[in-house]
């Protein structure tokens, strides 16, 4: 506006001037002109400030409208909208008038001014025009900003309109869905609609302008009440009640009404909004699947269903595969072709050669002749080059006979000492076996499976296998526990021809993702390394499950350094006509190991260990074996205090730490290792010179494996064993190992063993040598299930739990234990020798006793209580009947009744009166008789921990001292479902005593101990046998 008014004043002034006016102006005119210019500029600045302020206010109002539109009342929204429309109209009118004025003041008007102005005026006007141009530029920028603001406002209004349309469309769809889903509730809804209808009378908003209300109808619908939603909010409780009735209705009704009720609850049970008491307005509801409400019965049903599904899934893992329904593709096992050089050998030459190779013995028909070099076993050139590269010059004794036997397709049992090359003996035939078959396709499992008992052995076999697999293009995966399963699953899904595994984790892999990770349909070659320990450690069920899922015509190979006779029968179950190859006798220590056994006291062990370390540690690495994890950690601390850097290895360490410890020990980073028997197998360490058995091994096989860690691959090694006098029972196995390996037995060790045998013979005990672990895993049979059910029943009874489906649980715990005892009571009259245990009277007391006796006889005579009057009443009645007389009513004196009561009380108190002892003593050489009470309590059917509780030596001794009764354990344990043969009895406790009270006290104490153990089983019950450690 400033620019247009200024031009207008200039044009009117030019019209009023005379054409003959002089070119010069007076000073007053100039001053007035400058003042007008200053005032116009100040007015322009004020106008610009006002525009900027108004623009900021408009923007801030728009932001506030976006945030607070739903929270403000409708009246303020309408008034604000009216003010907004009026301001827009004013801005549009201003912009239109400004455009007309700017077009009327064109640049051509400046040329129509009089040409008789002075040059000074032209200069002044030139300066003013430059300022005016600058102002014009500013005004144009302001107009652009205004246009941009109007565009943004229009765009915002358009977006709001579209959003409202979407909301209305969504509301309509939700309304239709809700109406479709409440068909079954229509009758109840109609009844409640007649009682109470929704009305908008309590809406206190008055419409000021009906025309504006119609224009703003779209905005008002966003805030208006949805009658259906409001009604559903009010009948919320009725829907819940109907839902509860439908759930309780039964299976048939549940199937019909279940989906409908679920959908209604989805609409209703949303997050509860705070509803004003005066204004019951609808709330925008969204589907919230997580907010669905369930009754307690529905939740219980879901839990039961989930538990049943989980148990069914677990049972499915135990189901064997029906191989008759699977069509396996054929494969070839026999690849061995005997070279002419071996074919020419006679049987005598073969026997001589086997004798030279450390006395190879072979059992089984059709075993091929042993080879003498690698080229004779029929392997490829790639494998020969790998053998040469890694330093395998010629076959070891076990390899000379095992490789051709396996190449011929026969099952094998290989027995050889540690460090003899058993791994290569089954790897080379395996590579030939795999290369003969077609390559794996997507989704197929391995061709060869190697199972080991320990993770360390699995890693070592994998490392050995990868030396050859890379050149052959085969993939090897090591599957073992203690590490993340996701990486191993990823490797198996990519495919692998060879899997080296521990049995437990392999079963997890076969069951993962419903068997989609891997399978055993392509497996034709199975290896069990350290097979005896795998069965001893309780892996038998897992191994058998894996083997049973492999095709029956597979080739199975077993290798171990020890193979007890008890394992052979078990091994032959999964082998078909096996060949047994044994090298160097059964379980012997390598001749390269120098063995020393030291009989020493416990306190001197550590000092002797320090002496050995000072002598041998500079020459190589050292392993110290202990029996328990806590002993390993304790010895580690002692060695660290003695400035010996060392590490500890046992089963309680994480798998990652175990791997790093073994790598550091193999690399020579740490040369001293304290370990339990977990490192006794499969640990091949170069430059290992000394093995110290700090804790004496408890059986022969463990000693052989510990000593076998040193003296490998032809190197010299030393093995020292500490044994104390308390460990004399282990001396027999140590002596056996020394004798079989050709080592002299120390005299002090022989003396310790002979003293132990003499002591056992004196105690009447039979000496049995330990044959290794006898652990076993789950059998998953009916016997275990019956035992578990029986234990659960006892636990319920111990806790007083009652189940409507279990009648036995309601029986009292004492009655339950009493019934399981199946007790048998006996009372025997025992004749004792005449010698009395009462000491003979002294000379001083003899006269007093004689006087007392005479007085007693005189009193009996006076009261007519002689011997003849004390005849038994039944005897008198019998005599009367025999004589033909009549039986009179017996007369019992008060003294007789008193004596009978006194005898009962004395029997309960285990008290013998002095008068009776005197009478018995006075009878002299006559023999006396007494009663012995016996009771038998059968404990065979109680849980194992309860039997242990009452049959331990300490418990029996404590009960005997408390009750003064003798308790012995008799019979044999029979598992549930197995009945004893004729002449045998189930295990029971025999309680014996001279009086009945002692027997009752002993029985009550035994019952108390069993009851406490049954109650404790409620929280600590485990189906496995308890060991030293618990899994927390």
Curated annotation (Swiss-Prot):
Residues carrying N6-acetyllysine: 263, 776, 904
Residue ranges of the motif DEAD box: 529-532
GO cellular component: Cajal body; fibrillar center; nuclear speck; U2-type spliceosomal complex
Residues recorded with modification Phosphotyrosine: 294
Catalyzed reaction equations: ATP + H2O = ADP + phosphate + H(+)
Cross-link (Glycyl lysine isopeptide (Lys-Gly) (interchain with G-Cter in SUMO2)): 186, 325, 779, 908, 916
Motif (Q motif): 372-400
Stretches the record annotates as Disordered: 1-227
Highest taxon, organism lineage: Eukaryota
Main function: Component of the 17S U2 SnRNP complex of the spliceosome, a large ribonucleoprotein complex that removes introns from transcribed pre-mRNAs. The 17S U2 SnRNP complex (1) directly participates in early spliceosome assembly and (2) mediates recognition of the intron branch site during pre-mRNA splicing by promoting the selection of the pre-mRNA branch-site adenosine, the nucleophile for the first step of splicing. Within the 17S U2 SnRNP complex, DDX46 plays essential roles during assembly of pre-spliceosome and proofreading of the branch site.
Protein name: Probable ATP-dependent RNA helicase DDX46
